Amino acid sequence: MSMLCYTLIIAFLIGIWAAPKSEDNVPLGSPATSDLSDTSCAQTHEGLKTSRNTDQRHPAPKKAEDQELGSAANIIVNPKLFQKRRFQSPRALFSTQPPPLSRDEQSVEFLDNEDALNRNIRAKRENHPVHNRGEHSVCDSISVWVTNKTKATDIKGNMVTVMVDVNLNNEVYKQYFFETKCRNPNPNLLQSECRGIDSRLWNSYCTRTQTFVKALTMEGNQASWRFIRIDTACVCVIIRKTDNL
C-alpha cells in the first residue's frame, strides 16, 4: 500500500514539473498594417536576442556595405519586444505597405483634435480667398517618409544601427520615419535666406531642427528600443549685422 502511495506521489510531481509554464503560452499579438501594439509589459529587460534570417541554400558573396546594411535588415523579432514599446510618435511607423502621401507627394497631414475642429474654418477661407495678400512660410520645407535609414544618432550622442526591415510572425515590416527637411530653391547655395527678413539689418538662413523618436535599433545581435534623432522642421536663424550696431 505504501509503495502505491509513493508511486502516485512521484507521478504527480513529474506531471507538475512537465506542465508548460504560463510564459511559454503568451499569445502573439498580430500588429496592424499602420502601426504595432503598444501594450506595456511587466518585464523590464531592455532587449530581446534575435536571430538573423539567412538563406544558406543560395549563398552569395557580399560587399562590406551590404554586410553592414544586412545587420539592420532581415531580422526575426520576437513579438514580445513590441509589448514594451512606449513613447510612440506619429513620425515613426512600422508597416507592411508604404504610408500614404498627400496629393502633392511631398507632405503628410496629421490631424489632431484641434485640426478637426478647425476644418470648417479652413474650408470657409478656401471658399472666400483673400487675393490682396500672400501667405508664405519663412523657410521652404519638404516632408517625406524615409524608408532606408540605417544609421542615426541616439540620445547619448552615439551612432547606432537602425533596423530597416523586421520579420514579425513571418511577415516583413518596414520601419518608416516621417522627416521634414529644408528645401533650398537655389541649389548653388548651401543655405537659403529666410523670407521676409530685412537683409539690411539681419543676416538670415534656413536650417533644420531635430527631435527624438523611439526607433528599433540593433547592437550586435540584440534588438532594442532607442531614442534617435530625425529632422522634424526647417526654421529661420537670424543674426544682427555688426556694422549696424
Swiss-Prot record:
Expressed by the venom gland. Its main location: secreted. GO terms for biological process: cell surface receptor protein tyrosine kinase signaling pathway; modulation of chemical synaptic transmission; negative regulation of neuron apoptotic process; nerve development; nerve growth factor signaling pathway; neuron projection morphogenesis. Keywords: Cleavage on pair of basic residues, Disulfide bond, Glycoprotein, Growth factor, Lipid-binding, Metalloenzyme inhibitor, Metalloprotease inhibitor, Protease inhibitor, Secreted, Signal, Toxin. Residues 19-125 form a propeptide. Residues 47-69 are annotated as: Disordered. It is found in: Secreted. PROSITE patterns: NGF_1, NGF_2. It holds the Pfam family NGF. Residues 47-66 have a biased composition (Basic and acidic residues). One of its GO terms (molecular function) is toxin activity. InterPro entries: Cystine-knot_cytokine, Nerve_growth_factor-like, Nerve_growth_factor-rel, Nerve_growth_factor_bsu, Nerve_growth_factor_CS, Venom_nerve_growth_factor. Glycans are attached at residue 148. Residues 1-18 form the signal peptide. Nerve growth factor is important for the development and maintenance of the sympathetic and sensory nervous systems. It stimulates division and differentiation of sympathetic and embryonic sensory neurons as well as basal forebrain cholinergic neurons in the brain. Its relevance in the snake venom is not clear. However, it has been shown to inhibit metalloproteinase-dependent proteolysis of platelet glycoprotein Ib alpha, suggesting a metalloproteinase inhibition to prevent metalloprotease autodigestion and/or protection against prey proteases. Belongs to the NGF-beta family. PANTHER family: BETA-NERVE GROWTH FACTOR, NERVE GROWTH FACTOR NGF -RELATED. This is Venom nerve growth factor 2. It comes from Hoplocephalus stephensii.
